[in-house]
Curated annotation (Swiss-Prot):
GO cellular component: nucleus
Complexes and interactors: Interacts with FBX5.
Functional note: Probable transcription factor.
One Pfam family cited in the UniProt record for this chain: Myb_DNA-binding
Localisation per UniProt entry: Nucleus
PANTHER family associated with the record: F14D16.11-RELATED
Induction statement: Induced by gravity in roots.
GO annotation, biological process: positive regulation of fatty acid biosynthetic process; suberin biosynthetic process
GO MF assignments: cis-regulatory region sequence-specific DNA binding; DNA-binding transcription factor activity; transcription cis-regulatory region binding
Name of the protein: Transcription factor MYB92
Residue intervals of the HTH myb-type domain: 9-61, 62-116
Gene3D superfamilies in the cross-refs: Homeodomain-like
Keywords: DNA-binding, Nucleus, Repeat, Transcription, Transcription regulation
Gene transcribed to yield this protein: MYB92
C-alpha cells in the first residue's frame, strides 16, 4: 500500500529559511530526533512541510556536514560510484561521510563532468567518445573555411587601397581629356555669322579660340603688333566684309611697312577686333590683354569707344594724337 497523500499545504510557508526557524528545527532534532518528518513541523512549531524540514536538516543543519573542497580520494570515489550507479546522488552521498547529495551533485555538474569531456570520455558511460571522429571531416572543412575567411579579411584592405588608387588615376585621366577637348569644343560652337550681334568682348574671345585653327593660312598679321596702338583712338569705321577691298578702308598714302598683306588676301579672317559699325550706338569697352604669340602680338591694351553724332566729334580732338589729325590721312576715306 502506498503512502497517503499529503494534506492540503496551502497555508504553509515557502521560501528561504530564517535563523529562528533553523534554531527551532535544530533544538527539536537534538532533543527528540527525526522519527517522522511529516509530523515534525507541528511538533517543532514550524509552519513548514515535512519535506522542507528534512532537506534543510540534511543539507545544511546537520552537525556532521563536511565543508570545503573535495579531496582527490573523494573525487575518485564519486567517479567510480557514478560509473556504476549513475545519477543516484543519495546513494553516493551515503558512501561519503559528511557530504550531502546536493553538494555531490553540484560538484559533479560543475567540475567532474567537464573534466571527463576534456579528457575525451563520455560522462554517462565513462568510455572514450567515438562521435568525435565521425565529425572530423566537418571540423576540417570548417577550419579551411575559417582560414580562407581570415585570409580574405587580411587581403581586403590591400584590394580596397588598390581600387581607390585605380579610381583616382582614372579620374585624373578623365579630367585631362576634358581639359584637352575643351578648346576645340568651344571653338566649334562659334558661329561667324553672329559677329554683328555679339558684343565686342565676345568677338575678341571668339577670335582667340579660332586663331589657333588658322595657322595654315598665309596671312601676315605682324603689322598689328606695331600699328594697332596708332589706330586705337580712331573713330568708328566700317566693318571689313567680303565685298569691300582693303584700299577702301585703310589709307592709301601710308607706307607698305605699315600694312603687310599676303598674296592670298581672301584668307583674311573677318573679325571686328578694332573695327566697329558706325550705326551702333551702344558703347563697348574692352580692357583685355590680348596675347597672340603666333601672330606677333605681345601686349595690346585698348579702350575702344564707338558712339554716334556729336559725341564722337567732341571727344576726337582730346583723344587723338596730333600727328593723326592731318587731313591727308583721311582724304581717301569715303
Amino acid at each position: 500500500m502506498g503512502r497517503s497523500p499529503i494534506s492540503d499545504d496551502s497555508g504553509l510557508k515557502k521560501g528561504p529559511w530564517t535563523p529562528d526557524e533553523d534554531e527551532k528545527l535544530v533544538n527539536y532534532v537534538q532533543k527528540h530526533g527525526h522519527s517522522s518528518w511529516r509530523a515534525l513541523p507541528k511538533l517543532a512549531g514550524l509552519n513548514r512541510c515535512g519535506k522542507s524540514c528534512r532537506l534543510r536538516w540534511t543539507n545544511y543543519l546537520r552537525p556532521d556536514i563536511k565543508r570545503g573542497r573535495f579531496s582527490p580520494d573523494e573525487e575518485q570515489t564519486i567517479l567510480n560510484l557514478h560509473s556504476v550507479l549513475g545519477n543516484k546522488w543519495s546513494t553516493i552521498a551515503n558512501q561519503l561521510p559528511g557530504r550531502t547529495d546536493n553538494e555531490i551533485k553540484n560538484f559533479w555538474n560543475t567540475h567532474l563532468k567537464k573534466k571527463l569531456i576534456q579528457m575525451g570520455f563520455d560522462p554517462m558511460t565513462h568510455r572514450p567518445r567515438t562521435d568525435i571522429f565521425s565529425g572530423l571531416s566537418q571540423l576540417m572543412s570548417l577550419s579551411s573555411n575559417l582560414r580562407g575567411f581570415v585570409d580574405l579579411q587580411q587581403q581586403f584592405p590591400i584590394d580596397q587601397e588598390h581600387t581607390i588608387l585605380k579610381l583616382q588615376t582614372e579620374m585624373a585621366k578623365l579630367q585631362l581629356f576634358q581639359y584637352l577637348l575643351q578648346p576645340s569644343s568651344m571653338s566649334n560652337n562659334v558661329n561667324p555669322n553672329d559677329f554683328d550681334t555679339l558684343s565686342l568682348l565676345n568677338s575678341i574671345a571668339s577670335f582667340k579660340e579660332t586663331s589657333n585653327n588658322t595657322t595654315s593660312n598665309n596671312l601676315d598679321l605682324g603689322f598689328l603688333g606695331s600699328y594697332l596702338q596708332d589706330f586705337h583712338s580712331l573713330p568708328s569705321l566700317k566693318t571689313l566684309n567680303s565685298n569691300m577691298e582693303p584700299s577702301s578702308v585703310f589709307p592709301q598714302n601710308l607706307d607698305d611697312n605699315h600694312f603687310k598683306f599676303s598674296t592670298q588676301r581672301e584668307n583674311l579672317p573677318v573679325s571686328p577686333i578694332w573695327l566697329s559699325d558706325p550705326s551702333s550706338t551702344t558703347p563697348a569697352h574692352v580692357n583685355d590683354d590680348l596675347i597672340f604669340n603666333q601672330y606677333g602680338i605681345e601686349d595690346v591694351n585698348s579702350n575702344i569707344t564707338s558712339s554716334s553724332g556729336q559725341e564722337s566729334g567732341a571727344s576726337a580732338s582730346a583723344a587723338w594724337p596730333d600727328h593723326l589729325l592731318d587731313d591727308s590721312i583721311f582724304s581717301d576715306i569715303p
